[in-house]
C-alpha cells in the first residue's frame, strides 16, 4: 500500500523549469500539468528548423515517458476561477496569463507547490499557492 504524498512533498513544475537546462534538483513528488505538454507541443510545431523540431520532440517524448501529466479536470477548473479572480483583484487581467494560471490551478487543486523560473508571472497568487522560484 503506497502512501499519499503530503502537501509539503507535492510539487508541480512550470514549463519554464522543464525547458531550463540549468535547474538544480528539486525535492518532492514532482508532477507536470497537461498545460505544460500543450506548451511544449506548440514549441515543437512552430520550430524554425527540422533540427530544432527534432530536439524539442525528443525532449517532449522523454518528458512524457517520465511524467504522467495531471489533467485539467473540474477541480483544476474551480481552482482556475479562484486564481483568475485573485489576479483581477490585483488590477491585472488573467487573459494574457491563461496558460500560467492553468498550471498554477493544477498545483492549487492538488495542494502542491509550484516551481517556476518566472515568479512574476504568478504575482498576486502568493496567498493561495506556494510559488518557489528556481
Label each PLM-derived region with a short phrase.
Residues 14:
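Conserved catalytic-loop position in the HRD/HxD motif
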Residues 117:
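Conserved acidic donor-binding loop of glycosyltransferase catalytic domains
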Residues 120:
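Flexible glycine-rich beta->alpha loop in the catalytic core of nucleotide-sugar glycosyltransferases
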Residues 17:
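Short, glycine/acidic-enriched loop or turn micro-motifs at the edges of active sites
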Residues 2-11, 21-105, 113, 123-134:
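PIN-domain endoribonuclease scaffold, especially VapC-family toxins
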